[in-house]
Amino acid sequence: MELDQDVNRIIKSKTATKVSAMQAEIEANHAYIYDVQLKKLLRLHDEELQERCHTPLRKLYAKYSSRAEGNRDLQTWAEHVERDLRLLETTLRLVREGKAQDTEQAPGKGDRIFRSD
């Protein structure tokens, strides 16, 4: 019972104690840290990030973006060349198959029209 009275007296006390003074100081420090130092830290971090990361990346993009556009043209050109090569390969295969069929058939007068012997 005596302990309860002491606790109630401490809790309901209007006078400042060392603990309440320490708590007030902690709360004031927290407010200062949050309102001033954290905002300052975020601003410094943003400036540092901008300076070390964003700006160099932007410069790299500006430097090499025109080359990347040229590579798109190169890709299109390579696709056309590949298509033409496939067309030539198919044509050669068909010509070889045609020659093989011509040699298997008995030579006749009609066959000589297309041959240049």
Curated annotation (Swiss-Prot):
One of its GO terms (cellular component) is endosome. Keywords: Endosome, Transport. It is found in: Endosome. Residues 97-117 are annotated as: Disordered. Signal peptide: none annotated. It comes from the Eukaryota. GO terms for biological process: endosome organization; regulation of protein localization. Component of the biogenesis of lysosome-related organelles complex-1 (BLOC-1). Component of the biogenesis of lysosome-related organelles complex-1 (BLOC-1), a complex involved in endosomal cargo sorting. Belongs to the BLOC1S1 family. This is Biogenesis of lysosome-related organelles complex 1 subunit BLS1. The gene is BLS1.
